[in-house]
Amino acid sequence: MVPFLKILAELIGKGVEIRLIHAKEPGQPFREDFDRYPRLHKYLERVLCPRVHFKCIIIDGKQAYFGSANLTGAGMGAKSENRRNFENGILTDEPSLIEPLSEQFDSVWRGANCKKCGRRQFCPDCPIT
């Protein structure tokens, strides 16, 4: 299995813009893997929002995956057979599903909910001061 971070770094190398919203700073093993891909440091746009629990990937507003899996070895099926999580998800090109996902992602990205969020003290990327 090709590491997810390697795929992201290769896409960035091809000029693909990638935005990532995550709920907390990743643990040490992930950070060590992340450090292997200098392009990610320079070009991956990311925002930390402690309220985010959704998992979705939107590609050019035309395709989307959404489901329960975290982007971890256990969530993505990279662990040994007996250590994988039971997950589900949907891959779609249906605009009626993609549009609300895109709207939700963009809303969080812009910080639309930051003023009323009770966790701003944990959010270093909140655009509202």
Kindly give the residue locations of the regions a language model identified.
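PLD/PLD-like phosphodiesterase catalytic module centered on the HKD motif
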Residues: 1-129
